[in-house]
A protein has these predicted regions:
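Amphipathic, interaction-prone secondary-structure segments
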Residues: 41-84, 89
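Short acidic DE-rich linear segments
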Residues: 132-138
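Negatively charged, low-complexity tracts enriched in Asp/Glu with abundant Ser/Thr
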Residues: 2-53
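A short, surface-exposed interaction/processing loop segment used at functional sites
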Residues: 85-118
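Active-site-proximal segments of catalytic enzyme domains
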Residues: 111-123, 127-132
């Protein structure tokens, strides 16, 4: 399941907070089967509480599991040669972003996201696999 993010924001912090809320919603929808299952509720609670957002000079790093798993990066400067402020980048490794293409922009909205991280790219337009499938099949 993916969540479409359509809202626009004026600050990186607000855009990231909205994106994390969407990821939390996606996580709950992926694993929650209903009822008052204690295990599912604990998993959801731990996931929601485990986000770490660390601002650096060029990127804001977003991690899950209390910083143990790199989730993605957001460009937080206007001086990047390839990307604009707010662009979402997939992880190339634990401490570096993949600089091939942005997966969306937290300030502009208009992208899909899921709890596992920024979506993969397909084709020259940069549409994600899941977004493309939803458009064709759903």
């Amino acid at each position: 399941m993916t969540v479409a993010i359509k809202k626009t924001f004026k600050t990186i912090e607000d855009g990231i907070a909205n994106m994390i809320a969407a990821c939390n919603h996606d996580y709950k929808g992926t694993f929650y089967v209903g009822g008052d299952d204690e295990v599912h509720n604990k998993m959801i609670e731990e996931f929601n509480a485990g986000w770490v957002v660390k601002e650096g000079s060029k990127y804001t790093k977003i991690s899950t599991k209390n910083g143990g798993c790199a989730w993605g990066f957001v460009v937080n400067t206007d001086n990047d040669k390839k990307f604009k402020k707010g662009d979402i980048l997939k992880c190339a490794g634990f401490s570096a972003p993949a600089r091939n293409a942005a997966r969306g922009n937290v300030l502009d909205g208009g992208f899909s996201i899921n709890w596992t991280g920024p979506l993969y790219l397909v084709g020259p337009a940069g549409y994600s696999i899941k977004s493309t499938k939803e458009g064709i099949f759903g």
